[in-house]
C-alpha cells in the first residue's frame, strides 16, 4: 500500500507490550482535522441530545483513534469520518450503562434512520438528527460508498451494537464470535471503505470480511484489556452487574485474578495478530486480490497497532476521567414478522365455536356478546405485517421535528394514515388484478375478494374513528376532504385503464395530486391542526411535490428496478394496463409506427389480461427509443431539487434545520 497521508511514529511503550507483532504504528498527518470532527460532534450532541459533562471519545493526547487506525484516510474525508466515529463512541457509552430493553430501544432509534423497513419508534430524535446530518454530508462527498456504509451500519445496529451485552458467556471461545461482531466490524468496514474511497468487488467481499476478522478480534480484545476497569465501574454504578468484556469471561472461566486474566487475554491478542500478519503477507505474495481489497486488509494491520497505541493512554478508559452517561426512558423493541392469522373452523350455523342447542329451547331469546373482529381484520392484519418502506411514517416523524405534535395525537394520526394506506392497497390490488404485494400474495389471493373488500371498508371506519378521537372538528373535515380526493383520483386511474384512454400529462399529475399526494396532504394537515405551535407555514406545496415524486419514482422503478420486479413482478404496471408517466410520454412523442405498436400491445393486454415477457421487453425498447425513461428520470431530478427548495423555505419559516427530512428525500433518489 502506498503511503501518502501518514507517517510512521515510534512509541517505546507500544514496542514493550509485544502485542502487535512488530506492525509499525502509522498516524495520519491531518490530526487537526480529526480533532475538528470530534469537536463538531460534541457541539452537535450538546445541541441536539444533551450535555456531555466531561465525556471522552476518540481524542488522545498525541493523536486520535481515526488517525491511528485509518492512517491513509483521505484528508478531505477525515473530519467527516472522525465525526462518525465520535458519534459511535457517544452512542456506545449510552448503551454501556443501559438495561437490555434500553439498549434495544437506543439501537432501534438509530436503526430507524438507516433502514426504512424498521418501524419508526418516535419523532425524529436528537440522535437521528445528528445521524441524518452526518449521512447527508457523506452522501454529498461519495454517494456510492455512503450507501455501502449505511447498509453496513444498519447490519451492525440490527445484530450487534451491545444487544448481547447482557448475555452470560461461560468461556472465551464462546465470547469471541460475539466480540468480533460487537467491536463494530460491519460499521468499521463501511467507515474504512468510505474514508479511503475503496470499492470491494462483490466476488471478493466474503473472503475479505472473513480474513479481516482476526484483525478485529485483536483490536477488540485489546480494547477489552484496557477498558475493563471502566466497564466494571459502569456495571457497578448502573446496577446491571454484567460486564461484556473478555477479562470478566476469562476470570470466570479459569477462576483467576485480573492480572492473570489479562495475561491470558494478551496471549490471545498476539495469536490473532500473528495470524493476521501471516495472512496479509500471503495475500501480498499471491497478488490475487484487487488493489482495493488488499488496501482494506492492509489497513487492518495498522488498525491493530493503531488501536493498541491509542488504548495505551487515551482518556476514554481512564477511570479517573469517567463520568456517568444517562440513558433515555425505556423503549421496548417491537418484533416484526409476517402474520397470517390461523383460520378457525366454521360450523354450519356461522358461529366460531361448536355450540349445541340441545336442551335450550329459548336460544333465540338469548342476549349474546358482540362477535369478534378477528375475521374482518384478518386481511388487513396480513397486509400490515408485510415488509414496508415506511417512508410516510418517517416523513411524519421528521416533520414533527418542527410541529411538536404530542405523541398521543401522533399515534392517532399514524393510525389514520396507516389504515387508509393499507386499505387502499387491499382495494388497489383487487382493482388492478395484482397477485403480489411486496413479494407476498396479495390479500385477496389468500382471503378472497369479498372478505378483503369488507376488511378494507371496515378499516376506513376505524380510520374515521381515530380521526374523531383527535378531538378537533377540523381534523374530521380534513379527513373527509382528503379521502374524497383520494377516491376521485383513483376513479380516474381506473377509468383511463378500463377505457384505454391516454391521459394528458397534466391530467395524470392532477390524478397523482389527488391520490398519492392526498395521503401526504392529509398527514401534514392533520399534524398542523394538532400542533401546539402557531403554524403559518404552508405544507401544501411540499405534499404535492412529494406525492408526485413518489408516484413517478414508482412508475420508473416498476420498469427498471430488479428489486421491484422481485416484489411485484416484471413491469407489473404494464400487465395492469396502467398509464404511467413513461408510457404517456412514449405515446405522446413516439413516431407513428412505434405509437401504433404501443397501442396494439395495450389492446393485446386487455384481451389476454396481461402481457408476455417478450411483449414487455418490446414496450421497454420503444420507450428507450423515445427516451421516455430518460425523460422520467430527469423529471425526478427536477422534483428532488424543488422538494429541497421547499424544505429550505420551511427551515427558514421554523428557524430549525431538519436533517432527517432531507436525508429521507436524498435516500430516495434514483441512481
UniProtKB/Swiss-Prot annotation:
Dimethylallyl diphosphate binds at residues 437, 515-516, 551, 558, 568, 578. A motif (DDXXD 1) lies at residues 92-96. Mg(2+) 2 binds at residue 92. A motif (NSE/DTE) lies at residues 223-231. The keyword Isomerase does not apply. Its EC number is 4.2.3.220, 2.5.1.158. Mg(2+) 1 binds at residue 92. It catalyses: 5 isopentenyl diphosphate + dimethylallyl diphosphate = all-trans-hexaprenyl diphosphate + 5 diphosphate; all-trans-hexaprenyl diphosphate = talaropentaene + diphosphate. Gene3D superfamilies: Farnesyl Diphosphate Synthase (1.10.600.10). Its cofactor is Mg(2+). One of its GO terms (molecular function) is lyase activity. It comes from the Eukaryota. It holds the Pfam family polyprenyl_synt. Keywords: Isoprene biosynthesis, Lyase, Magnesium, Metal-binding, Multifunctional enzyme, Repeat, Transferase. A motif (DDXXD 2) lies at residues 428-432. GO terms for biological process: alcohol biosynthetic process; isoprenoid biosynthetic process; mycotoxin biosynthetic process. Mg(2+) 4 binds at residues 428, 432. Isopentenyl diphosphate binds at residues 389, 392, 421, 438. Mg(2+) 3 binds at residues 428, 432. The conserved DDXXD motifs as well as the NSE/DTE motif are important for the catalytic activity, presumably through binding to Mg(2+). PANTHER family: GERANYLGERANYL PYROPHOSPHATE SYNTHASE, THIJ_PFPI FAMILY PROTEIN (AFU_ORTHOLOGUE AFUA_3G01210)-RELATED. Bifunctional terpene synthase that converts dimethylallyl diphosphate (DMAPP) and isopentenyl diphosphate (IPP) into talaropentaene as a single product. The C-terminal prenyltransferase (PT) domain of MpMS catalyzes formation of hexaprenyl diphosphate (HexPP), whereas the N-terminal terpene cyclase (TC) domain catalyzes the cyclization of HexPP to talaropentaene. In the N-terminal section; belongs to the terpene synthase family. In the C-terminal section; belongs to the FPP/GGPP synthase family. This is Talaropentaene synthase. It comes from Talaromyces verruculosus.
Amino acid at each position: 500500500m502506498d503511503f501518502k497521508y501518514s507517517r510512521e511514529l515510534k512509541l517505546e511503550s507500544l514496542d514493550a507490550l509485544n502485542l502487535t507483532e512488530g506492525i509499525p504504528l502509522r498516524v495520519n498527518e491531518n490530526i487537526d482535522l480529526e480533532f475538528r470532527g470530534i469537536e463538531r460532534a460534541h457541539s452537535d450532541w450538546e445541541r441536539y441530545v444533551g450535555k456531555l459533562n466531561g465525556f471522552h471519545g476518540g481524542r488522545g493526547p498525541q493523536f486520535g483513534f481515526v488517525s491511528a487506525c485509518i492512517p491513509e484516510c483521505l484528508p478531505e474525508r477525515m473530519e467527516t469520518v472522525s465525526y462518525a466515529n465520535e458519534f459511535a463512541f457517544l452512542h456506545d457509552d449510552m448503551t454501556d450503562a443501559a438495561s437490555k430493553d434500553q439498549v434495544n430501544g437506543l439501537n432501534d432509534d438509530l436503526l430507524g434512520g438507516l433502514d426504512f423497513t424498521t418501524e419508526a419508534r418516535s419523532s425524529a430524535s436528537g440522535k437521528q438528527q445528528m445521524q441524518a446530518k452526518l449521512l447527508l454530508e457523506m452522501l454529498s462527498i461519495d454517494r456510492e460508498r455512503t450507501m455501502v456504509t449505511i447498509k453496513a451500519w444498519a447490519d451492525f445496529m440490527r445484530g450487534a451494537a451491545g444487544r448481547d451485552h447482557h448475555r452470560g458467556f461461560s468461556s472465551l471461545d464462546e465470547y469471541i464470535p460475539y466480540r468480533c461482531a460487537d467491536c463494530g466490524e460491519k460499521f468499521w468496514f463501511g467507515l474504512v471503505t468510505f474514508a479511503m474511497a475503496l470499492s470491494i468487488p462483490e466476488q471478493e467481499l466474503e473472503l475479505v470480511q472473513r480474513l479481516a476478522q482476526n484483525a478485529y478480534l485483536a483490536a477488540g480484545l485489546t480494547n477489552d484489556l484496557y477498558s475493563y476497569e471502566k466497564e466494571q465501574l459502569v456495571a457497578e454504578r448502573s446496577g446491571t452487574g454484567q460486564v461484556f468484556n473478555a477479562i470478566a469471561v476469562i476470570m470466570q472461566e479459569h477462576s483467576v485474578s485480573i492480572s492473570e486474566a489479562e495475561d491470558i487475554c494478551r496471549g490471545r491478542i498476539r495469536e490473532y495478530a500473528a495470524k493476521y500478519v501471516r495472512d496479509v503477507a500471503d495475500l501480498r505474495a499471491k497478488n490475487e486480490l484487487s488493489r482495493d481489497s488488499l488496501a482494506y486488509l492492509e489497513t487492518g494491520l495498522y488498525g491493530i497497532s493503531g488501536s493498541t497505541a491509542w488504548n495505551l493512554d487515551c482518556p476514554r478508559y481512564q477511570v479517573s476521567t469517567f463520568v456517568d452517561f444517562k440513558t433515555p426512558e425505556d423503549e421496548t423493541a417491537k418484533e416484526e414478522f409476517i402474520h397470517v392469522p390461523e383460520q378457525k373452523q366454521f360450523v354450519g350455523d356461522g358461529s366460531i365455536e361448536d355450540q349445541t342447542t340441545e336442551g335450550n329451547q329459548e336460544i333465540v331469546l338469548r342476549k349474546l356478546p358482540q362477535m369478534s373482529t378477528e375475521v374482518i381484520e384478518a386481511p388487513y392484519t396480513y397486509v400490515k405485517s408485510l415488509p414496508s418502506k415506511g417512508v410516510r411514517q418517517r416523513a411524519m416523524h421528521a416533520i414533527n421535528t418542527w410541529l411538536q405534535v404530542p405523541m398521543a395525537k401522533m399515534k392517532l394520526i399514524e393510525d389514520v394514515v396507516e389504515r387508509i394506506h393499507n386499505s387502499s392497497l387491499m382495494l388497489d390490488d383487487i382493482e388492478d388484478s395484482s397477485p403480489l404485494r411486496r413479494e407476498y400474495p396479495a390479500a385477496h389471493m389468500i382471503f378472497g375478494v369479498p372478505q378483503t373488500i369488507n376488511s378494507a371498508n371496515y378499516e376506513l371506519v376505524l380510520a374515521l374513528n381515530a380521526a374523531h378521537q383527535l378531538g378537533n372538528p377540523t381534523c374530521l373535515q380534513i379527513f373527509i376532504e382528503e379521502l374524497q380526493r383520494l377516491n376521485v383520483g383513483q376513479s380516474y386511474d381506473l377509468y383511463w385503464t378500463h377505457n384505454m384512454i391516454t391521459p394528458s400529462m397534466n391530467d395524470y399529475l392532477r390524478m397523482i395530486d389527488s391520490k398519492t399526494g392526498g395521503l401526504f396532504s392529509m398527514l401534514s394537515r392533520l399534524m398542523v391542526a394538532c400542533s401546539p405551535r402557531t403554524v403559518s407555514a404552508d405544507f401544501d406545496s411540499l405534499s404535492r411535490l412529494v406525492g408526485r415524486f413518489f408516484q413517478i419514482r414508482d412508475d420508473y422503478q416498476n420498469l427498471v428496478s430488479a428489486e421491484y420486479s422481485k416484489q411485484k413482478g416484471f413491469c407489473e404496471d404494464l400487465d395492469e394496463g396502467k398509464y404511467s408517466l413513461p408510457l404517456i410520454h412514449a405515446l405522446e412523442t413516439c413516431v407513428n409506427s412505434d405509437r401504433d405498436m404501443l397501442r396494439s400491445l395495450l389492446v393485446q393486454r386487455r384481451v389476454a389480461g396481461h402481457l408476455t415477457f417478450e411483449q414487455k421487453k418490446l414496450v421497454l425498447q420503444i420507450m428507450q427509443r423515445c427516451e421516455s425513461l430518460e425523460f422520467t428520470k430527469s423529471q425526478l431530478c427536477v422534483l428532488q431539487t424543488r422538494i429541497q427548495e421547499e424544505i429550505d423555505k420551511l427551515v427558514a419559516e421554523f428557524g430549525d434545520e431538519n436533517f432527517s427530512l432531507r436525508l429521507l428525500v436524498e435516500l430516495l433518489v434514483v441512481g
